[in-house]
Design a protein with these regions (language model features):
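Conserved loop->alpha-helix
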Residues: 1-172
Length: 172
């Protein structure tokens, strides 16, 4: 289980795709602290299991179902990713419960800025929107956010400048 509070952005060093799965190598620092083989790490909100690690990063397997339901299939060497370690019992709980089991992928339709926020309008199909509730929690690329508006074919979230600066959302 995760909280949606991104600990760092890592970089994809390599990705080896097979016909039905992939192996991804990610350069990281913070999430390596006290890492063990078999530990869970959220990569853009997707729960992956560390299968190997070094002082420079970790490796994880990505199953066929995960490639089909998430945007991890789009990763390339050099891609930046949001990373978070699994929540430790008794640990600080700053976001919302994020299981790391992805329901689907939306598309950023519009980005607008106002004084202290960046608004993201995201198009999504009914298979995703049936789970989206105004003022409810949602994880986008693993980031804990609150839904500000819901429309028949899209929803919107508002992001503070700090969150935009330390996550992938700020690079869109």
């Amino acid at each position: 289980m995760f909280t949606g509070i991104v600990e760092e952005m890592g970089t994809v060093k390599a990705i080896r795709k097979g016909p039905h799965s992939a192996v991804v190598e990610i350069q990281a620092q913070v999430v390596l602290e006290d890492l063990h083989i078999g530990d869970s790490i959220a990569v853009n909100g997707v729960c992956l299991t560390a299968t190997a690690f070094s002082p420079a990063g970790f490796t994880a397997d990505v199953m066929h179902e995960t490639l089909n339901r998430s945007a991890l299939a789009l990763l390339r060497p050099g891609s930046r990713v949001n990373l978070e370690r699994a929540l430790a019992a008794g640990g600080r709980f700053g976001g919302h419960i994020v299981a790391g089991h992805v329901d689907g992928v939306g598309t950023v339709q519009r980005i607008t800025r106002d004084d202290n926020a960046v608004w993201y309008t995201i198009a999504a199909g009914p298979e995703i929107l049936r789970y989206v509730v105004e003022k409810g929690s949602i994880a986008i690329d693993g980031i804990s956010l609150t839904v500000a508006r819901v429309e028949p074919d899209r929803f919107a979230v508002s992001v503070i400048p700090h969150t935009a600066a330390v996550t992938l959302l700020g690079r869109r």
